[in-house]
Design a protein with these regions (language model features):
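Short, charged, surface-exposed secondary-structure boundary motifs
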Residues: 20-21, 115-120, 172-174
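Conserved beta-strand scaffold positions in the cores of enzyme catalytic domains, especially
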Residues: 8-10, 103-107, 160-163
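An accessory alpha-helical subdomain
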Residues: 134-137, 141
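Short beta-strand-centered segment that lines the nucleotide-binding/catalytic pocket of NTP-utilizing
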Residues: 6-23
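NTP-dependent small-molecule kinase module
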Residues: 79-81, 121-124, 143-178
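ATP-dependent NMP and nucleoside kinases share a basic, alpha-helical "lid"
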Residues: 71-128
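Conserved nucleotide-sensing/catalytic segment adjacent to the nucleotide-binding pocket
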Residues: 18, 23-68
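Short, small-residue-biased leader/transition segments that mark boundaries at the very start
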Residues: 1-3
Length: 178
């Protein structure tokens, strides 16, 4: 199995939040704003996704600045893209909007406490939150996410894998890249 000959790219939904007044005001009034659809710039994300999918190239990388509530575009041309990875809190929802089955959905199941440690560390370091706020925001977003996505809420796709601690990753990789 050789994946080094394949060129891939990762689109993180974390880099596609809305900007401007919406993202500055609404978080003050809407609990868990950044974990809800209203915060996600789905139009821009879909535009980038479709361009990469159709053309096999990417022109720039996008980065969301949580303190300034802006998206920075950095020129970074990538050619001959043969696979595209979508990751982030809106990935599952986005996969439900795809019109074809030309994708593989991987969901990594983690324990709530393990996930919270990782997210709190990220939020303190990258999003300028204090630890208590990051913990409270995580608990709210965990509830929002699991309310929204009951088991099997993803549309039926034979290429859906749920990865847990005891999952045989080699089997999944063989199916993905052979």
């Amino acid at each position: 199995m050789c994946i080094r000959d394949r060129n891939g790219i990762v689109l993180s939904t974390d880099n596609y939040y809305k900007t401007g007044l919406i993202s500055k005001l609404l978080p003050k009034f809407v609990e868990g704003f950044f974990d809800r659809n209203i915060s996600f710039n789905s139009k821009l994300f879909k535009k980038d996704f479709d361009f990469i999918y159709k053309n096999g190239i990417s022109i720039c990388d996008r980065y969301y600045n949580f303190e300034k509530k802006t998206i920075q575009s950095i020129l970074n041309e990538t050619f001959n893209i043969s696979f595209l990875i979508v990751e982030g809190i809106f990935a599952k929802e986005f996969s439900n909007s795809l019109n074809n089955n030309d994708y593989i959905f991987l969901e990594i199941k983690t324990k709530k406490n393990e996930c919270m440690k990782r997210v709190v560390l990220r939020d303190v370091k990258e999003r300028g939150k204090d630890k208590k706020q990051a913990e409270n925001d995580f608990l709210k977003s965990w509830s929002i996410y699991y309310e929204k996505f009951k088991p099997d809420s993803i549309k039926k796709n034979r290429n859906k894998f749920i990865i847990e601690k005891n999952t045989d990753i080699d089997q999944i990789l063989k199916k993905l890249f052979n």
